[in-house]
UniProtKB/Swiss-Prot annotation:
One MF term in the entry's GO annotations: methionine-tRNA ligase activity
Annotated protein name in UniProt: Methionine--tRNA ligase
Keywords assigned by UniProt, alphabetized: Aminoacyl-tRNA synthetase, ATP-binding, Cytoplasm, Ligase, Metal-binding, Nucleotide-binding, Protein biosynthesis, Zinc
Cofactor dependency: Zn(2+)
Lineage: Bacteria, Bacillati, Actinomycetota, Actinomycetes, Propionibacteriales
Assembly description: Monomer.
The keyword Oxidoreductase is assigned to this record: no
The reaction(s) this protein catalyses: tRNA(Met) + L-methionine + ATP = L-methionyl-tRNA(Met) + AMP + diphosphate
Cofactor notes: Binds 1 zinc ion per subunit.
UniProt motif 'HIGH' region: location: 11-21
Residues involved in ATP binding: 353
Pfam families: Anticodon_3, tRNA-synt_1g
Any single Gene Ontology cellular-component annotation: cytosol
């Protein structure tokens, strides 16, 4: 057994999240975490709402709310949506908690005392019309390195290099198109060059494992070539105060939102332990060098997870060129793997809330089963390359693969048992074909589990559905509905099929947890083999306002292995597991999108 940290990207709370977001970080992390729990590992899955930064200020102004009011509203919406999708967070929290602020300031002080912050005069971008600071990501222009027209003020997505806004050629505000003014300002810069050698050694070690996706390791190594200090404070009044005399009193100096957001993985772990009244338990995942940690995100956040966050951890632990010693948290573990997904587009277009090219999670789940979307992400999502969500493909996969494949197998198995026996029948003498099928399905535990553990979820769901097809073929070949005068043989066939369905239900449960409980119930079980998260209203541990979290009791996961079915277990006629979709919804959804 290993301790496994599933560190899931923090959704930004300037609005509800769309399906492109959860396809990148949400579903893949939950499939992995569910499997790892079933495989016997001690999993801690954490995340939360990222609530600081200028985009929150802008969205709050547009909504006529304070930044805190906007964050409160959107955090609740996001938490409800993620829970409805069945994501099994041990803790989904937020960055405006007092706990998070304290942990971020502790990390800052550790990095500062070890000498990895340098104070520099730089240029800040100001909107001439509003006088408000423009964040790096709200400025775009031409990249001075590759010439790409559309580079952001913090990095160029075309060549991957880090940038500063005043480096851009012809910079302009993404808010109103005006040319920003640049004024001198003081900031703390993370001394990345002093951490470059340690970062490089860590990345080389990760590459040697052969586990990282090639695009992630290559990108991470390439950005080291142009490494330079990066500002970790901002001229803004919404965020976490800089915990130094002369700085904390300044209402317009705050820590960079990306400095604080990635620390959320640690602060959420600490909050989780505190809520258990075991305040040091988080250390089992962060200080134990044998613990494993997997970070899930979209590819636009690789830089922050394979450079900025590891650099912060190395600096706090005193592992860079300047040395140093850690403060109260001790030496902190570096990521075992950065699991980055590519982008999901929709009907050939980039998701864009402003252009209304968007399907919000809440809207999708109000009309369709969550497992239908989870299945689409696993089978056709952006695991290794960009993929496109189309309504026609969503309908096809739901109807042809879930309804006609897995759902049909479950329904006809339970119907045949209910009609002929009313309970799980005993198995008589097995034929070679019976035993071969049982052995083949049992082997899928090893094949599918290995693929999920190596973040090959598309292959994993493919192998599981191949086994479903194999069992469906066995049923068609043996034609149990035609057996009228040999109850022993009929019972044996249905026992074999029921065992295979029970096995496949466990194998598919990380992908299809809602259906897993229905299938278990159809075979006479309790319908509780796939634990679900819950929303809970809690008090801030340090005296702040109450807020909702996602948490859950996940000790009830079954083992990742065959569980022999029990003859005599009552089986009733089931209801369909999946809802067949009318092809007309394609035009309806496209019309809804255009309107």
């Amino acid at each position: 057994m290993s301790r496994v940290l599933s560190a899931v990207a923090w959704p930004y709370a300037n609005g509800p999240r769309h399906i492109g977001h959860v396809a990148g970080f949400g579903v893949p992390s939950d499939v992995f975490s569910r499997y790892m729990r079933m495989a016997g590992h001690d999993v801690l899955m954490v995340s939360g709402s990222d609530e600081h930064g200028t985009p929150i200020l802008i969205a709050a102004d547009e909504a006529g709310l304070s930044p805190q009011e906007l964050a409160d509203r959107n955090h609740r919406i996001i938490a409800e949506d993620l829970a409805s999708l069945g994501l099994t967070y041990d803790l989904y929290t937020r960055t405006t908690t007092r706990n998070h602020h304290a942990v971020v300031q502790e990390l800052f002080l550790g990095v500062y005392e070890n000498g990895y912050f340098v104070e520099q005069t730089t240029y800040g971008a100001i909107s001439p019309s509003t006088g408000r600071t423009l964040p790096d990501r709200y400025i775009e222009g031409t990249c001075p390195i590759c010439g790409y027209d559309g580079a952001r003020g913090d990095q160029c997505d075309n060549c991957g290099n880090q940038l500063d806004p005043h480096d851009l050629i012809d910079p302009r505000s993404k808010i109103n198109g005006e040319t920003p003014e640049f004024i001198e300002t003081q900031h703390f810069f993370l001394d990345l060059p002093a951490l470059a050698e340690a970062l490089g050694e860590w990345l080389d070690g990760r590459e040697a494992t052969g586990l990282w996706r090639p695009n992630v390791i290559r990108f991470s190594q390439n950005i080291l070539k142009e490494i330079r200090p990066r500002a970790m404070t901002r001229d803004i009044d919404w965020g976490i105060a800089v915990p130094l005399d002369g700085w904390r009193e300044n209402p317009t100096k705050r820590l960079y939102v990306w400095f604080d957001a990635v620390i959320g993985y640690l602060s959420a772990s600490i909050e989780w332990a505190r809520r258990l009244d075991e305040p040091d338990r988080w250390r089992d995942w962060w200080n134990d060098p044998d613990a494993l940690s997997y970070y899930f995100m979209g590819k636009d956040n690789i830089t922050f997870h394979s450079q900025i966050w590891p650099a912060e951890l190395l600096a706090y632990s005193g592992k860079g060129a300047k040395g140093g010693t850690p403060r109260q948290y001790g030496e902190l573990n570096l990521p075992t793997e950065v699991v980055s997904s590519e982008f999901l587009t929709m009907e050939g277009r980039k998701f864009s809330s402003s252009k209304r090219v968007v399907i919000y999670v809440r809207d999708l789940l109000s009309r369709y089963q969550p497992d239908a979307f989870r299945y689409f992400v696993a089978a056709a999502g952006p695991e290794n390359q960009d993929s496109d969500f189309t309504w026609s493909e969503f309908v096809r996969r739901t109807n042809d693969e879930l309804v006609a494949g897995w759902g049909n197998l479950v329904n006809r198995t339970a119907n045949l048992i209910a009609k002929n026996f009313g309970e799980i029948p005993k198995a008589g003498e097995l034929t070679a074909a019976d035993q071969a099928l049982l052995d083949s399905v049992a082997s899928a535990f090893g094949v599918v589990g290995d693929l999920i553990g190596r973040h090959r979820q598309k292959q994993a769901i493919g192998e599981a559905m191949r086994a479903v097809a194999e069992v469906n073929k066995y049923v068609s070949d043996t034609e149990p509905w035609k057996i009228k005068d040999d109850p022993d043989r009929l019972g044996t066939i249905l026992h074999v099929v029921a065992q295979c369905v029970a096995d496949l239900n466990l194998i598919l449960s990380p992908f299809l947890p809602f259906a897993a409980n229905e299938v278990d119930r159809a075979l006479g079980g309790s319908g509780e083999i796939a634990p679900m998260p819950r929303l809970e209203e809690v008090d801030d541990l340090d005296g702040g306002a109450p807020y909702p979290i996602i948490t859950g009791e996940y000790s009830g996961f079954p083992a990742w292995e065959r569980r022999p079915i029990v003859p005599g277990t009552p089986v009733s006629k089931p209801t369909p597991i999946f809802t067949k979709l009318d092809p007309s919804i394609v035009d309806e959804e496209l019309a809804r999108l255009e309107s």
